[in-house]
Regions:
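A short, solvent-exposed loop/turn motif at the edges and junctions
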Residues: 70-100
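Contiguous segments within soluble domain cores/interaction surfaces
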Residues: 43, 49, 70-73
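Beta-strand-rich domain onsets/edges
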Residues: 1-32, 44, 52
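Short, surface-exposed beta-strand/beta-hairpin micro-motifs centered on an aromatic residue
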Residues: 55-79
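Solvent-exposed strand-loop boundary residues in beta-sheet-rich modules
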Residues: 27, 41-45, 93-95
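Exposed beta-strand and adjacent loop surfaces of beta-rich binding modules
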Residues: 18-20, 34-36, 84-86
Length: 422
């Protein structure tokens, strides 16, 4: 038995979930090959259940781990809906990393990214990374209500004239006034994926997850657009406190289906007529805390089960005048998506650019085959795209669609920037 954490479930009441791990170097984001990962139940951390190794791309195979029945995440109960595991990661030339509290849900693929610190040559004290409980299971402070539309500042202007998707979010890991809390620079999409994985269950319907991701996106982009905390004298974008913003946990396990939804809609936010700024869409769990005129997370789950679309769920809580908008500017991206997919038979400059970017990425991720930069989308380009999609947890289609275009751009910018610094 892998699932040994004492939950209110019998041994006959056990499902399975999945885990895949990707290890990168903390100082340059280069994949860490041949890292060894020991997996243990949190209740018995010194009794490894599995041992797996990363490949040349820093990625492990997907493994099956025991998880509580899926029903535990379908309605509020006294049964913890996820199992928890500890990871110990070791690799030549790097300090050991320990992560405690990796959460596995029934039927879902957990993606655990691990940032490994190069060995400094001197012995260090272990400081395990502890992943806190999910917001729908643990008790966190309820959101302090705010106006959903922020007033202009005293100078009569808001710093940004248009809604921009930032390259990074600066997350203050505590309350705004906690000067001991650390600030983290987090890529925008990774931040949204982390928050969604903290706030809702990946076992919920696609429609419900999409509605909640839209609310998280809009809330976050309101903080970016209004420069809410910077206007108060702070040097960060948002906090990890549920009393002020949403939950974000350093090194949190994210889930593949949530990741793919975020990649598909990360430029969207929620608007009202004649209001430029993204709406500060606040929400609560809807069970322990109720919040009239805000979205109920559990309520949105039940609406999704009934077949409501994401915008129908949104309007059920925020009103019929709410609509989905899209940011025109994405920071840090070489070129915007052309508006159409690239696939077998496509030709031209956009194809050449993708080929060039894939070849650069392949220098860091060697399983991606290099291709001839000729502007013709043939079988070799399709194969390179498919391998890229496998590595970065996108649907493997061999087609450069909207999510794949921006993921290639993001990774290309990352590896190119790192090369400039070396």
């Amino acid at each position: 038995m892998l699932f040994r954490k004492p939950l209110k479930a019998t041994q006959d009441n056990i499902d399975e979930g999945f885990l895949q791990i990707q290890a990168v170097s903390d100082n340059n984001q280069i994949p860490v090959a041949d890292a060894t990962i020991e997996i243990a139940n949190t209740g018995e951390p010194n009794k490894p259940l599995e041992q797996i190794t990363t490949d040349a791309d820093g990625i492990t195979e997907r493994i099956s781990l025991d998880a509580p029945p899926v029903e535990f995440s379908m309605e509020p109960t006294d049964n913890q809906p996820y199992s928890e595991y500890n990871l110990k990661i070791s690799a030549p030339g790097y300090e050991d990393t320990i992560i405690s509290g990796v959460q596995i849900l029934s039927g879902e693929v957990g993606l655990q990214n691990i940032r490994m610190t190069p060995a400094a040559g001197s012995e260090r004290l272990y400081n395990p990374i502890v992943i806190g409980g999910h917001t729908l299971w643990e008790f966190y402070p309820p959101k302090i209500a705010e106006a959903e539309i922020k007033p202009m500042d005293e100078r009569g202007e808001i710093v940004l004239s248009r809604v921009v998707i930032p390259e990074y979010i600066v997350v203050h890991d505590g309350t705004p006034t906690d000067t001991s809390a650390l600030d983290y620079y987090v890529p925008f999409q990774e931040y949204i994926k982390n928050v969604a994985s903290c706030e809702i269950y990946a076992t919920w319907s696609e429609s419900t997850i999409t509605a909640n991701v839209l609310a998280i996106l809009s809330f976050t982009l309101n903080r970016v657009y209004t420069e809410w905390y910077r206007g108060k004298g702070y040097d960060f974008t948002i906090t990890s406190s549920t009393a002020f913003d949403h939950k974000w946990i350093y090194q949190k396990t994210i889930y593949e289906n949530i990741s793919q939804i975020v990649d598909s809609i990360f430029t969207n936010y929620l608007s009202r007529p004649n209001v430029t700024q993204p709406i500060l869409t606040q929400y609560c769990d809807g069970k322990r805390v109720t919040c009239p005129n805000w979205m109920s997370q559990w309520g949105s789950k039940y609406l999704g089960d009934q077949g409501y679309t994401p915008i129908e769920i949104i309007r059920n809580y925020y009103g019929d005048d709410m609509y989905i908008n899209e940011a025109e500017i994405i920071s840090g991206i070489p070129a915007s998506w052309p508006g159409y997919d690239l696939s077998i038979g496509s030709t031209g400059q956009k194809v050449s650019m993708i080929q060039e970017q894939l070849n650069r990425i392949a220098q860091n991720y060697p399983s991606i085959p290099t291709v001839l930069i000729d502007g013709n989308y043939g079988e070799s380009t399709k194969s390179a795209v498919e391998q890229f999609q496998r590595i970065f947890n996108l649907p493997v289609t061999g087609i450069v669609d909207y999510p794949t275009w921006y993921k290639i751009s993001q990774i290309y910018v990352g590896v190119s920037r790192i090369a400039e610094l070396i």
